[in-house]
């Protein structure tokens, strides 16, 4: 089973999406940004920084997740860009 939470309080703010796969002890943090086409790369980087700075993985860690992956996603119209970061745990 996968557990999903949206706009949930975690760390020092509210992250867009948290996913937990308890049997594998895997957690996923997703932060999304809307950006102009020429700023999509930067928006992905900003999303990953926000995940770290606001400690959005804190709730996943307290729930026992050991492997945490962060996704910074930027959207512009029908296009999106994704950057992946691994949480140091």
Positions of PLM-derived features:
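Short, small-residue-biased leader/transition segments that mark boundaries at the very start
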Residues: 2-3
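C-terminal amphipathic alpha-helical interaction region
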Residues: 6-11, 17-23
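An acidic- and aromatic-residue-enriched active-site/binding cleft used to recognize and process polar
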Residues: 9, 22, 33-35, 73-75
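Mg2+/Mn2+-dependent nuclease catalytic core
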Residues: 35-57
């Amino acid at each position: 089973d996968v557990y999903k939470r949206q706009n949930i309080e975690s760390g020092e703010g509210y992250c867009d999406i948290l996913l937990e796969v308890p049997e594998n002890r895997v957690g996923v943090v997703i932060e999304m940004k809307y950006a102009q086409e020429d700023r999509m790369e930067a928006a992905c980087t900003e999303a990953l920084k926000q995940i770290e700075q606001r400690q959005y993985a804190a709730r996943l860690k307290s729930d026992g997740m050991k492997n945490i992956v962060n996704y910074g996603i930027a959207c512009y119209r029908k296009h999106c860009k994704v950057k992946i970061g691994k949480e140091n745990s």
